[in-house]
């Protein structure tokens, strides 16, 4: 259940979430219709089979899950059928169908195929920290994260959440850390980084499974390369890769945190998920607050 990536947004802490339990049922995921391509809505964080609990609230943390049902209709299948249909028309009429007729035929084919198309189920989780006003969406895709924010906005009627940004150059800060400048307290370098030329379209160097403070890295820095992604470790609790787009990738919870889970009193799957969410949300908050000051992260207007 642990999140693996974090795309972050800020929102005003003055927002009221007290009615969340009463409004969520109206935004529940409904099955995709026979002639629909997709359906989105909220599902229980504890799984689609759970019908009563559509969110999880622990203190200032709120866990929401957006579920999707998407029809799988490969373009190659549609295009093959379209080619056959157009060939049949050309044989009968002596000329191929025009652009407008071709589009109509394609729409008719899609309309015919949709009820028989396979349905792909997916989910994206989000954690809202109501005290500090940020959303952590479990995806590295900005587009997918925006979809979740849009669903929350539709749910609440208004949700002025904005993508996280910084008042400084993230590349410059990451580069300074790898060059030897002090890191924020409790953070250490990992064993992975990506470096890019300052010029657009320049060389990209990817380093993995190696010490980052070394002669090889220094040579890249000397010729002007800047760090665009950097692996970091928060104590022995969390490892992650921070990008210059402020997306946190490859999020992994380490033994220092997991040991707490092993010693917690959990009885059953639901209790274990509650315990995991409590530990994970606390670590994500600690990480967020640790990065907020040195990176001068944006705040939302209340």
UniProtKB/Swiss-Prot annotation:
It comes from the Bacteria. The keyword Cytoplasm applies. It is found in: Cytoplasm, Nucleoid. The keyword Endoplasmic reticulum does not apply. This is Recombination-associated protein RdgC. Its main location: cytoplasm. One of its GO terms (cellular component) is cytoplasm. The lineage of its organism: Bacteria, Pseudomonadati, Pseudomonadota, Gammaproteobacteria, Lysobacterales.
């Amino acid at each position: 259940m642990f999140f693996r990536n974090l795309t972050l947004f800020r929102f005003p802490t003055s927002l009221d979430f007290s009615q969340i339990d009463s409004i969520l049922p109206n935004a529940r995921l409904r099955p995709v219709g026979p002639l629909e391509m997709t359906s989105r809505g909220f599902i229980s964080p504890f799984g689609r089979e759970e019908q009563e609990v559509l969110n999880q609230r622990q203190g200032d943390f709120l866990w929401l899950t957006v579920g999707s049902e998407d029809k799988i209709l490969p373009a190659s299948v549609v295009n093959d059928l379209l080619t056959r249909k157009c060939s049949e028309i050309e044989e009968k009429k002596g000329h191929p169908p025009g652009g407008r007729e071709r589009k109509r035929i394609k729409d008719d084919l899609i309309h015919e195929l949709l009820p028989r198309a396979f349905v792909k189920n997916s989910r994206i989780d989000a954690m809202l920290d109501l005290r500090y006003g940020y959303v952590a969406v479990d995806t590295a895709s900005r587009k997918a994260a925006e979809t979740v924010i849009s669903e929350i906005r539709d749910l609440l009627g208004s949700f002025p959440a904005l993508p996280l940004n910084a008042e400084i150059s993230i590349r410059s800060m990451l580069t300074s850390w790898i060059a030897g400048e002090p890191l924020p307290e409790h953070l250490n370098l990992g064993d992975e980084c990506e470096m890019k030329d300052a010029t657009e379209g320049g060389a990209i160097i990817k380093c993995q499974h190696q010490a980052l403070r070394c002669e090889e890295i220094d040579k890249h820095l000397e010729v002007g390369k800047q760090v665009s992604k950097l692996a970091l470790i928060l104590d022995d609790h969390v490892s992650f890769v921070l990008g210059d787009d402020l997306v946190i990738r490859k999020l992994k919870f380490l033994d220092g945190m997991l040991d707490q889970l092993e010693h917690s009193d959990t009885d059953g799957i639901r209790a274990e998920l509650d315990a995991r969410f409590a530990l994970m949300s606390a670590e994500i908050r600690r990480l967020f607050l640790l990065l907020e000051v040195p990176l001068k992260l944006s705040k939302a207007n209340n």
